[in-house]
């Protein structure tokens, strides 16, 4: 059955006290509305509609890659009013699923349960029973247990306020009925708004079957109105992701101290120490160990690689059996072949480091192509920038570079060459040559040491 999916994202979100649209605030490193759009996009045969209003330009710009139909609601008058704005774009057949841009943890599996029950004479509601239902619309059922209406908190009687089953706001309605119901909505209520929930009573009146589905947990349908609720959902999501990683064979030394701000994929027997941040798309191979206080962003780490504490890796590719850190920084464009080693206080950028090569301490290697089994001494620098342009340093296999060497790019060092410590290399070094470029040492006898006055 074809579906229209409407995501409501027009609210002002004044309690967030922010210059940004509420739905653009992030949970797990991803804007809430993008999480909802991503989940909605998994449903087949669907057309997305995004209702925007307050700061709608921000929302539209942030979500343009989803190719959703943008519908403006500049003067919001309730959820029913939002659907009425979308009504001209709805397909004649099929059904319309209503979601919310500030309910970011809704699961595709829950929506699939709803769509499985959908047909031209059935309305599907997502409901949940809460110990404290304050603030939610109550689900009213008749003696046979059939849903007959949803009553909002401000319009509910005392007996209705005692009902624990509440409306989550998410519903799936057949389009052949929905158009008429939307046209018949009125704003005769305490808020003076057009409630989408009023279509439930209309469906019951018209003999349409009303069935309910429940989410897996309360967090799945929790909305965000302020930063306290945002923080609570952040913790919930991080806990869910931590549990999933452990169930898939990763060890987290403290599951409460990991932050995943994107997508983290791990092989078996991965070990992650405390206070690590994973941002964007990160892949950790089998047997990878990540020490404490590391930050990995948009990178792939090969099997059995060890990443020691306080290391930053960004937009890099790391091979198998590598050894990185502590206190190392791999900047965008770094590629480490298998068994490469990057030690403490080493920074790389747009650097290809060959198999078995070692940059053990206190070095900067940028815009470099380095072969296999190269040893780079402490304090070595590639001088890649002339003030205007970046230049390439090329180091072939089996090169030994002494400590405190400066390689002034563009420069090439051929296979098997050796560079003496303290050299500044500005010219090509040939195969198996020894290069030294430093001032001659002079020793003066009986030199008088300066005396403090």
From Swiss-Prot:
It is an enzyme of class 2 (transferase). Keywords: Acyltransferase, Cell shape, Cell wall biogenesis/degradation, Cytoplasm, Magnesium, Metal-binding, Multifunctional enzyme, Nucleotidyltransferase, Peptidoglycan synthesis, Repeat, Transferase. The keyword Transferase applies. Binds 1 Mg(2+) ion per subunit. Its EC number is 2.7.7.23, 2.3.1.157. Its cofactor is Mg(2+). It catalyses: alpha-D-glucosamine 1-phosphate + acetyl-CoA = N-acetyl-alpha-D-glucosamine 1-phosphate + CoA + H(+); N-acetyl-alpha-D-glucosamine 1-phosphate + UTP + H(+) = UDP-N-acetyl-alpha-D-glucosamine + diphosphate. Acetyl-CoA binds at residues 378, 384-385, 403, 421, 438. This is Bifunctional protein GlmU. It comes from Marinomonas sp. (strain MWYL1).
């Amino acid at each position: 059955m074809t579906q229209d999916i409407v995501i409501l994202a027009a609210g002002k979100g004044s309690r967030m006290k922010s210059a940004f649209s509420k739905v653009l605030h992030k949970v797990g490193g991803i804007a809430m509305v993008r999480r909802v759009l991503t989940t909605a996009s998994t449903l087949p045969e669907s057309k997305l509609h995004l209702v925007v209003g307050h700061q709608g330009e921000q929302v539209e710009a942030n979500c343009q890659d989803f190719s959703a139909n943008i519908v403006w609601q500049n003067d919001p008058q309730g959820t029913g009013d939002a659907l009425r704005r979308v009504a001209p774009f709805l397909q004649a057949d099929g059904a319309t699923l209503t979601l919310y841009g500030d309910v970011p943890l809704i699961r595709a599996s829950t929506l699939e349960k709803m769509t499985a029950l959908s047909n031209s004479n059935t309305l599907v509601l997502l409901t949940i029973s809460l110990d404290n239902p304050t603030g939610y619309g109550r689900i009213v059922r008749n003696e046979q247990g059939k849903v007959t209406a949803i009553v909002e908190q401000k319009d509910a009687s005392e007996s209705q306020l005692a009902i624990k089953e509440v409306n989550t706001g998410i519903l799936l309605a057949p389009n052949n009925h929905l158009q008429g119901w939307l046209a018949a909505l009125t704003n005769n209520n305490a808020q003076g708004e057009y409630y989408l929930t009023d279509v439930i009573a209309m469906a019951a009146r018209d003999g349409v079957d009303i069935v309910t589905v429940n989410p897996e947990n309360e967090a799945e349908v929790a909305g965000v109105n302020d930063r306290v609720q945002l923080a609570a959902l952040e913790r919930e999501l991080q806990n869910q992701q931590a549990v999933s990683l452990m169930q898939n064979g990763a060890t987290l030394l403290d599951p409460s101290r990991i932050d995943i701000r994107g997508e983290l994929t791990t092989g078996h027997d991965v070990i992650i120490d405390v206070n690590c941040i994973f941002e964007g798309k990160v892949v950790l191979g089998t047997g990878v160990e990540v020490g404490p206080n590391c930050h990995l962003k948009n990178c792939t780490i090969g099997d059995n690689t060890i990443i020691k504490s306080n290391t930053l890796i960004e937009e890099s590719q790391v091979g198998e059996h590598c050894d990185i850190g502590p206190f190392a920084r791999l900047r965008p464009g770094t590629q480490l072949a298998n068994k490469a080693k990057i030690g403490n206080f080493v920074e790389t950028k747009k650097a290809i480091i060959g198999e078995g090569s070692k940059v053990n301490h206190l070095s900067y290697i940028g815009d470099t192509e380095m072969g296999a089994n190269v040893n780079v001494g402490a304090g070595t620098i590639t001088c890649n920038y002339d003030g205007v342009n970046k230049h390439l340093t090329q180091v072939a296999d089996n090169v030994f570079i002494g400590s405190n060497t400066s390689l002034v790019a563009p420069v090439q060092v051929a296979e098997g060459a050796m560079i003496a410590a303290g050299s500044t290399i500005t010219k090509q070094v040939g195969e198996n040559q020894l290069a030294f470029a430093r001032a001659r040492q002079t020793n003066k006898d009986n030199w008088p040491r300066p005396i403090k006055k």
